[in-house]
Amino acid sequence: MEWEIVIGLETHVQLATESKIFSGSSTRFGAAPNTQANEVDLALPGSLPVMNRGAAERAILFGLAIGAKIAPRSVFARKNYFYPDLPKGYQISQYELPVVVGGTLSFFVGEEEKTINLTRAHLEEDAGKSLHDEFHLANGAPASGIDLNRAGTPLLEIVTEPEMRSAAEAVAYARALHGLVVWLGICDGNMQEGSFRCDANVSVRPRGQVEFGTRAEIKNVNSFRFLERAIQYEVRRQIELIEDGGKVVQETRLYDAERDETRSMRSKEDAHDYRYFPDPDLPTLVIGQDWVEAVRATMPELPSAMRARFEADFGLPAYDAAQLTISRKLAAYFEAVARALPAGQAKLAANWIMGEVTATLNREEKDIADTPVQAAQLAALINRIIDGTISNKIARDVFAAMWAGENGGEPDAIIEARGLKQISDTGTISAMIDEVLAANPAIVAEYRAGKEKAFNSLVGQIMKAARGKANPQQVNDLLKAKLSA
């Protein structure tokens, strides 16, 4: 039987505010346990929540960026459940009237563009954190501790429709969403610190079946690699279970990265299990059109708009434009390089940034903001390729030297110091070709007998004689002319 995978994602995005969503406590990460929790976070009797305007504005900004409807009236609700790190015995969230409704997000899976519909995005408070490894009782027995520093940190929970059909598609969506919230400045995107956490709802069904299968939710996956592996494992588990005559149980599961498997955590609740009702301590959040427009005025150029501009202004393919707008810093870096080159050479800049620059950043686990090669320096290097001073191959060696800080990272100084200027003098190259042809009559005969590979062998020997500095195009042209004579 052929199976179809159905995936929907719920992503918890910690909003980059200085204080918590309903209290004045700091949201700074890494403080000593329970030093950033006041009476509201601790749910002490008589304490009342006060809405953080900045959290609402960040939610509005996100809604505008995805083309969603901003609800003119939004209500906070109590989501009732017990957990040790939830002091109130309920979480303040949103249910029937979220702040953001609908919207879409487009992204690339390989070179294929996809668009996913979003159901909603709602504001809520984060819970505290249970710590299980650091504590022991006086008799040595294991114990757990509770850190409430995170309790009350503002979250935007972003929910998709169940429209993704592969783990690769889910990861591509998650990367695009991560890029967007960081681009907008509403989240720092630090997955190791829990700023961006994904829950994946996964089910399978026979291909062609309309009804959804029973889903399992995989909780709090904090890396893109783990998200892909968790979904892949869960899909295999469900298919094997069904094909062996079993039934998938609706439940919440955790991904164990060390064992590369998901395991059951608890039965999956439905909405009615949480007994949602409007929070009587918080008034309705009223969002007037003037407030929406004020937030819209702060919006940066969006990735989608910048992609379209890069395609129109620089003639880039859609895939290149998408890759170069993964982050604002990368997009700004590319644009600075492209505008420092002659007209029509932006594609060369794109190739270098998506190739050599990105590969080096990945190898050294750095962000584009940390590159030692500035945009002006990369543009100067590419200009030396364009004007024929060096070949593309030699340019890669120069780039490595620039990255290492040689000669201040200036390409012209490195080229001069290393004597790397390309040989473009026709007479000099012609003499080298004559020497190679005279020394290799057998290879010349093979080429003239129709063996095309012999040509590449001759080119290789000429470039070796020139120590890689001969202009490759001139070598090809002159060699072909001499062999045809």
Swiss-Prot record:
Signal peptide: none
GO biological process: glutaminyl-tRNAGln biosynthesis via transamidation; translation
Keywords of this entry: ATP-binding, Ligase, Nucleotide-binding, Protein biosynthesis
InterPro entries per record: Asn/Gln-tRNA_amidoTrfase_suB/E, Asn/Gln-tRNA_Trfase_suB/E_cat, Asn/Gln_amidotransferase, Asn/Gln_tRNA_amidoTrase-B-like, GatB, GatB_C_1, GatB_Yqey_C_2, Gln-tRNA_amidoTrfase_suB_CS
UniProt GO molecular function: asparaginyl-tRNA synthase (glutamine-hydrolyzing) activity; ATP binding; glutaminyl-tRNA synthase (glutamine-hydrolyzing) activity
Pfam families in alphabetical order: GatB_N, GatB_Yqey
EC class: ligase
Catalytic activity: L-glutamyl-tRNA(Gln) + L-glutamine + ATP + H2O = L-glutaminyl-tRNA(Gln) + L-glutamate + ADP + phosphate + H(+); L-aspartyl-tRNA(Asn) + L-glutamine + ATP + H2O = L-asparaginyl-tRNA(Asn) + L-glutamate + ADP + phosphate + 2 H(+)
EC number: 6.3.5.-
Biological function: Allows the formation of correctly charged Asn-tRNA(Asn) or Gln-tRNA(Gln) through the transamidation of misacylated Asp-tRNA(Asn) or Glu-tRNA(Gln) in organisms which lack either or both of asparaginyl-tRNA or glutaminyl-tRNA synthetases. The reaction takes place in the presence of glutamine and ATP through an activated phospho-Asp-tRNA(Asn) or phospho-Glu-tRNA(Gln).
Assembly information from the UniProt record: Heterotrimer of A, B and C subunits.
Family under the similarity heading: Belongs to the GatB/GatE family. GatB subfamily.
Protein known as: Aspartyl/glutamyl-tRNA(Asn/Gln) amidotransferase subunit B
Organism: Bordetella avium (strain 197N)
Gene designation per UniProt: gatB
